[in-house]
């Protein structure tokens, strides 16, 4: 059954690298706020060390993860085996958002894939790793990645993406600020 570790082991990193899908969960401090759970793919995440992961975060209609990280930093990642031996792997930690133009952008961007529509990088320091059986996770065949988001971003172009982010990504659904919103406020 489940085991707990204080770092990402080599076998955990290898398992993570094989998964075409992961989930990231965050929540605001307000008990009435909305918990967020987002599926992510596109081979966007990398294990950077035994206690750090990062992923490229694409432009989307919401920016809940970033707002929650700005408020409290709490983050959980989950990876599931949909084929092969059953396994669920969770990474618990504290995350932050890095925007293009931030001092440490290049240090992280150079270690991650370049994807059209990238709006920010999410970096997390991991302090707990937990495995569980995964016996109830169904078998599923991976077909291929969806290209829709990359195609949309390429068609829209960077200037239009910036405008879109300023319209859609500055506040959470619970009206929390995001780093994009804070940066925009400092500019104006």
Describe the residue ranges of each PLM region.
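Binding-site signature for planar aromatic cofactors or substrates
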Residues: 1-188
């Amino acid at each position: 059954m489940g085991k707990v570790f204080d770092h990402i082991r080599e076998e955990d990193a290898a398992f993570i690298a094989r998964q075409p899908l992961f989930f990231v969960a965050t929540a605001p401090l307000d008990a009435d706020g909305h918990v967020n759970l987002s599926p992510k793919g596109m081979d966007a995440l990398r294990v950077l060390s035994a206690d750090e992961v990062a992923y490229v975060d694409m432009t989307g209609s919401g920016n809940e993860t970033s707002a929650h990280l700005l408020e409290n930093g709490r983050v959980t990642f989950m990876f599931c085996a949909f084929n092969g031996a059953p396994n669920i792997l969770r990474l618990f930690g504290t995350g932050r958002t890095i925007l293009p133009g931030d001092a440490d952008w290049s240090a992280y961007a150079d270690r991650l894939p370049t994807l059209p529509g990238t709006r920010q990088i999410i970096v997390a320091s991991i302090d707990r790793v937990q495995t569980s059986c995964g016996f109830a996770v169904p078998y599923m065949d991976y077909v291929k990645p969806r290209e829709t988001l990359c195609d949309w971003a390429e068609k829209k172009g960077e200037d239009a993406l910036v405008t879109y982010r300023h319209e859609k990504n500055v506040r959470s659904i619970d009206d929390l600020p995001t780093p994009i919103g804070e940066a925009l406020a400092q500019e104006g």
